[in-house]
């Protein structure tokens, strides 16, 4: 099933490009390994396209990433950081540190890790020429009406929506987790 979804994704991604595109599929059951493999692929010119966490036929619970590159494209190179935790306070702290270092949100998923249980995984990207810093705000609540109110408050403060998951966090149980960001500086 997952392979069918990935192949469908690849065909959709491939249909909107100008010229040939090369894809790299990465799959592992450790987020630390995934970050290392993503950065190795990035050094070869690949860029993050999408992710999903779940049970695969061959590997059990895995996080699966799709990366792509256009052959011969000498464009920007990227660095990647994966954040994975069940604690919203830890995620907020790690997002803040990464944002200050110029990392930009590119995706998130839920992943059942062997060691951490059900975690929110956030993928961040920084180009080799990044000169912008970001501030991130993580909102987590079990009530969708509260989330709507908090999103509007953050929007009035200049935060833009990045992504959302429904997750089981360490303190709040099942929560809607939203991530927002705003630009805070340029060199």
Task: Describe each PLM feature range.
Residues 1-5:
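Bacterial N-terminal signal peptides that target proteins for export
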Residues 6, 12-187:
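Terminus-proximal functional modules
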